[in-house]
């Protein structure tokens, strides 16, 4: 354990209910105004791996789906950005799109399982790129995989070719690309979209990195790997999404919050509160799971036993929604608690 982490732990104990960073109160005010540029306020040499980053699971479903099954978000990508979401789980598959009379071409399109969203991958990237152009102090993370459940559009070689071409085209501008390194800093990431792909579309990533060793087990894994062109990092990962054990899911979420807080710089963490209870991801089962887990993590981050360190990337369902029917989802409160955690302890700085 380094001296910087010892300092963080000691300072956190002294200021449990008061933000260490003076701009934390400003951040809360910005959120209420719908313009939450919280990354802009962080020091350039802070390690990105130790940040607390709110993210959305199957982010594009909030822009609309062809039917409600598998809809995990209520807000559009733009609305998610406005509330401070900076990590986006996107699932591009592909489909044929009409380009003229009797002319069709394959195009990357976002799905959740067999459910088609109303958003193309190009459109989703454009939303993020436009926001970064307007807010160059921010950055975004895309966590993606090949969603290949369609019986018609499931050929891996087609997807590989489409993705390789897209990530090197003008649709993914060169100024948004960045190669992954474990020790990336906030300053290096400003204005960029870091792409972490769970499926390798080429021998080496065109931008960002590939992720291997993904796990859906209740206990998660501390041995997944993020591999960039020239460097790799350990990934601590919890994505227990088909929740047969409510208490086990909550315990795993809180365990990975602690693991993230105690990790050395360069170790990354992705922690999902998302998922569903029961046997199928229906609207009700997704919201019940969100209520169970979002409240638990919110209470943990705002309570007296909160971890004295970053949470890593937290992916949740129904961001921005406080309640829906009988469910208290805390989709508004949890992302802000994650954001505020960046200002609750001294960040470890590269070179210091």
Across the structure, where does each feature detected by a protein language model lie?
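Acidic (Asp/Glu)-rich catalytic clusters
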Residues: 43, 129-137, 186-188, 260-261
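Sec-dependent N-terminal signal peptides
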Residues: 1-5
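C-terminal motif of bacterial Sec signal peptides marking the signal peptidase cleavage site
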Residues: 8-11
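Structural recognition of the beta-strand scaffold that forms the well-ordered cores
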Residues: 49-54, 86-93, 139-144, 193-197, ...
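Metal-dependent phosphodiesterase/phospholipase catalytic core, i.e.
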Residues: 93-95, 105-172
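Surface-exposed substrate-engagement region within the catalytic domains
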Residues: 169-308
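Short, aromatic/basic amphipathic alpha-helical patches
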Residues: 154-166, 206-215, 326-340
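Long, acidic (Asp/Glu-rich), low-complexity accessory segments flanking structured domains
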Residues: 15-83, 96-134, 203-205, 273-352
